């Protein structure tokens, strides 16, 4: 028995999003295609590239995007010079910070400090007009809006401070919705859609699983969540490692918290269904009982959490380090993680999951290991 819904969740993470692209290629190799893709920030860009292309071109389009925005900083270092790699990566990140990333963003000229208050130029360091052009070339928005695969993009309303999802279920998606989902301040300016200003959804939460939880009915689903930041790590030994560890925790902490709460909600829902089943007939029609029944709908969910746990050689600049070597390594890591773990979770059927939420974490700790479903 297959799952009624195959859902792919993609976090934010800048350059780390190449790992997500590799995971998607691994899923394609295994014959898994999502029916719904939810993304935030770079995850929104990857999501649009997936949903906005026919299945046979999706990996090709992802590769083209990541090739365009990665920078060749020179020939690969020989093994005996590998100790220089962190310095080379840092130089690549400084290039991204000072001159921008081709096909993605560029520094504002004149600089923001010379812009008049209230203008778009005064609200960010960089201009994402190049990303708009890239998206409109590589993404078929007519295909997205036909709704064959559902697409949801997380952003935050700047003035209201609330999370918003642009969803093909009720919204016609265009390139500005994707830019809004990735408009992380103060680097990128808010994007105006229908008179409202939107920033990167990661300002509120970097993990879009809470949006899926609110979907009803969704009784039967396999949810593949791809995390770009790892909540677990060693104790920092210098200031650079402090900055990296703080960033990892900041952008990953809600991921585990949300999944733990979802499992607890599943357990409470099962208890609620048991209690409702023992109510006398006269009480089952009570409004409070009916409200409880609606909140305790039966769900058979398998959540696969794939995390790039490999140590970074880019340190605290890893999310804006776009050297081609690093991008390729992240992509390969994503493919390998699917290949190495899929035998442990691909055959877990809805019947085995039962009426509850189970989580499988094949890449959560180092070294890589396969972990049984919880």
Model-derived features with residue positions:
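Active-site gating loop/helix substructures
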Residues: 112-218, 225, 232, 237-245, ...
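Hydrophobic/aromatic beta-strand patches that form the interior of the parallel beta-sheet core
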Residues: 38, 154, 222-226, 302-306
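C-terminal helical/tail subdomains of lipid-metabolizing enzymes
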Residues: 115, 122, 126, 130, ...
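Short active-site oxyanion
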Residues: 33-36, 196, 301
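Patatin-like phospholipase
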Residues: 2-9, 14-125, 129, 135, ...
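Acidic, Ser/Thr-rich peripheral helices and adjacent loops at domain boundaries
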Residues: 237-279
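Solvent-exposed loop/turn segments at secondary-structure junctions
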Residues: 15, 230-231
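Active-site-proximal substrate-binding core of FAD-dependent oxidoreductases
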Residues: 229-230, 237, 355-356, 360
